[in-house]
């Protein structure tokens, strides 16, 4: 796994952070946790969650007290320059986060390779199938990487629904507001381990859609059958159009 390898000896900061964050969260978010027993005591598992706020990747680990949860982090966390960049890389590496290139294609494959290794080690891997935060609180179409990981490793997929994190930390807000947060862990979706030639697009799309349906039921979110990245692009274009129209209005 190279520099991004998640060694158990590196997880001391993860456990320290979870303890400290847990104490703060109890006072600030008063998180309500449902279905934690659906996460196995041992063995590999994938936590597939909706994505509403930056704090999602902190809320999940502090509510899973009996397992370490590893997440992907954007490449920028690991490539920063100077002292700040080195400290950022050190922090994320030691809390079980590893880099992924979000441009997709072959560049993103290295992140999936690391995720497979984490699962093959019998660990818990957390992923947001939407690929980015929801721009409006709705649930968007999932990318098939989660299904590919599940089929390649035979890992059960546990749908996770976060509620309230986008109210606590709206887009653009750094420090979360005080607001109750709810985390619901659904029943595992058992997934067989398949050979590469058996992993067809139809199977990938089918399992991914099933996962997203489970998340939708748990979260109560409205589902939108398009990728969140596409919706964000639409919103930017709409905003630019509004600005252009405003300039054209005569005084």
Where are these regions (language model features)?
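Short, basic, glycine/proline-bearing loop/turn elements
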Residues: 20-22, 94-102, 129-133
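Structural motif corresponding to alpha-helix initiation and N-cap regions
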Residues: 33, 84-85, 109-112
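Catalytic core of membrane glycerolipid acyltransferases/transacylases, capturing the structured
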Residues: 41-105
């Amino acid at each position: 796994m190279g520099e991004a390898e998640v060694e158990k000896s590196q997880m001391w900061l993860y456990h320290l952070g979870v303890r400290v964050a847990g104490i703060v969260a109890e006072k600030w978010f008063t998180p309500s946790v449902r279905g934690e027993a659906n996460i196995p005591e041992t063995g590999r598992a994938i936590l597939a969650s909706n994505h509403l706020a930056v704090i999602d990747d902190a809320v999940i680990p502090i509510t899973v007290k009996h397992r370490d949860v590893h997440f992907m982090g954007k490449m920028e966390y690991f490539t920063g320059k100077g002292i700040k960049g080195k400290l950022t890389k050190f922090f994320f590496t030691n809390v079980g986060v590893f880099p992924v290139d979000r441009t997709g294609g072959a560049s993103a494959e290295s992140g999936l390779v690391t995720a497979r290794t984490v699962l093959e080690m019998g660990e818990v891997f957390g992923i947001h199938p939407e690929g980015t935060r929801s721009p409006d609180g709705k649930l968007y179409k999932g990318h098939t990487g989660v299904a590919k990981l599940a089929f390649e490793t035979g890992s059960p997929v546990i749908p996770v629904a976060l509620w309230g994190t986008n109210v606590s930390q709206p887009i653009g807000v750094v420090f979360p507001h005080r607001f109750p947060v709810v985390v619901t862990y659904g029943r595992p979706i058992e997934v067989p381990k398949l050979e590469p030639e058996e992993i067809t697009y139809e199977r990938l799309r089918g399992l991914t859609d099933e996962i997203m349906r489970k998340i939708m039921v748990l979260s109560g979110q409205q589902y939108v059958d398009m990728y969140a990245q596409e919706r964000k692009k639409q919103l930017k274009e709409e905003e630019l159009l509004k600005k252009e129209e405003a300039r054209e209005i005569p005084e």
